[in-house]
Amino acid sequence: PKITQYHSELAQHQGLFEKYQVLKNSVEFFQLSRVRQKVVENELRDFRLGGAELSVEKKARFMQIQEELSRLYSKFEENLLDATNDFALYPTHREDLAGLPADVLDAAKEAAAQDGKPGWKLTLRAPFWMPVMQYADNRALREQMYRTYVTRASEFGNSEWDNTSLIAQILNLRQEKARLLGYANYAEVSLARNKMARSPREVLDFLHELGKEARPYAQRDFADLKRFACDELKLDTLEAWDIAYASEKLRDKYYSFSDQEVKQYFPEPQVLRGLFQLVERLYGIRIEKTETPVWHPDVLFYNIYDVGGRLIGQFYADLYSRSTKRSGAWMDEAIARRRKNGSVQIPVAYLNCNFSAPAGGRPALFTHEEVITLFHEFGHGLHHLLTSVEELGVSGINGVEWDAVELPSQFMENFCWEWDVLKNMTRHVDIVETSSIAGAASVSGIASPQETSDPPLDGAMPRVLFDKMLSAKNFQSGMQTVRQ
């Protein structure tokens, strides 16, 4: 609340607002660099969207709305996290978990042991929920976990965490906020704050056109999946909790590989080393792990140096799922680059993911999709960390419209489909353990999944497997586009 109050008061500071207005209308404004002109323009925009032009009475109401929205946003996230963490299953019969990969079972067994329970522990966190949806042969288990997942923090669960009324309050307050600022709706407010799109109608027209083009392909994909589920899996109906499971089976049929086979070639140490080597070649930088106080033992901290050995950025990497973390993957700024008192303030970023942690004595193994996610978020990080702009308000990700900020991150994803990159960032986990690359611990007695080909002597992913992945790149792309 205090932070929200500070930002609300700052956005309505009449003295500062008037100073920026005077500067914008002066001859001196046109003598500023384009970067500094952009800072002034952005500040004036933010003052207006913060209620600086409102009457005294409306300013007070606007500030109340801001503080109440902040409280509701926080409560919404807390409810979702609490509802997610409230669910846990402890199966004790191995046959109930048929189809689940060995590394998932290892992690589930360790989680149950930590709770002092026998068997395995399954939760709604991504490292458990997603493999159950994709691999579990037990349809009843898939249905139970799916229904629980999609009804979290709703009227269908524990009323203590029901977000239904919060959503209504948020929508009403946003609408009132928009009207106070002179807009017809909150969508217009959102677009006015640093977006390329000019109107909600422009956005809706784009989405409708995209949906129109993608829908026939999605319908074809879904019909193909339904036919396969009926003929091959003997499912009378294709329910929501069957889609990921049936899709994995269908892809295996078409392309003769599975995510689990691919996963064996992406142990975390090798993936990070390959990622860092790539960006070092691309940008002439050097990334080094270093020690610093962190909020959890899993968190790593890195320095970035330029070709001359000068420190230019730092970042935290918090890659594993935990009960205290919100879901998904994201990059956020801790410190932005700026020039102050003749010296440059070094930018610092947070890189957050929710990947499976190491289990069974083995390093963490990433799916190819998780590798893409890592590259995506690191692209955001590079955008923030390698900026040369030295004005705080527009350095790094702050200087780009929100509907364009995904460009650097999606650009980085492309490298995950390049053989010259992938062959240097893959190594079979058995080879990694044997050679202790990157300090991975050596273990034994854990069976590997069935593979279509043995790993090469150096352990890199076989080219034939990569070619299969490339062939399957657009598998169900119609469904994915419509879902997105």
Model features per residue range: what roles?
Residues 434-447:
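Intrinsic, low-complexity polybasic segments
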Residues 39, 68-71, 78, 82-123, ...:
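Active-site-proximal, well-structured secondary-structure segments within enzyme catalytic domains
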Residues 159, 163, 264, 268, ...:
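Alpha-helix N-cap/helix-initiation motif
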